[in-house]
Amino acid sequence: MANTQYAGTGRRKVSVARVRLTPGSGKITINNRSFEEYIPAANLRAVVIQPFAVTSTDGTYDVNVNVVGGGFAGQAGATRHGIARALLQVDPDFRPALKSAGLLTRDSRMVERKKPGLKKARRASQFSKR
């Protein structure tokens, strides 16, 4: 029997998430740890499960994610992007819903680099008139 697996790669900031969907009960595993253990913040957990809410596929697929780089927010965004791309492989009819929710677009915003002569990217040292 062929084991149906759907894969998707998601990226956000410097994080990269490799996502595998298999038909199941809705169990999410990230880096071999449970979803709740890996992402303790409720707002970031909501970000991760957003593609399932948009496509009404809550609890129908088990998710196995390998995510590297970045922090919690970047990894959550990368995981969401990967899940959305994997759901497209499950059913191409999900594209309009995912596209209108903005889940298929790679968020291109990156950290602005620090400039020489400044303390941070835009923060200059305090100006003294005299």
Swiss-Prot record:
Keywords: Ribonucleoprotein, Ribosomal protein
GO biological-process terms attached to the record: translation
Superkingdom to which the source organism belongs: Bacteria
Regions of compositional bias (Basic residues) in chain numbering: 116-130
GO cellular component: cytosolic small ribosomal subunit
Biased segments, Basic and acidic residues type: 106-115
One of the Pfam families matching this protein, by short name: Ribosomal_S9
Gene Ontology molecular function: RNA binding; structural constituent of ribosome
Region annotation (Disordered) ranges: 105-130
Family: Belongs to the universal ribosomal protein uS9 family.
Name this protein carries in UniProt: Small ribosomal subunit protein uS9
Species of the source: Oenococcus oeni (strain ATCC BAA-331 / PSU-1)
Name of the encoding gene: rpsI
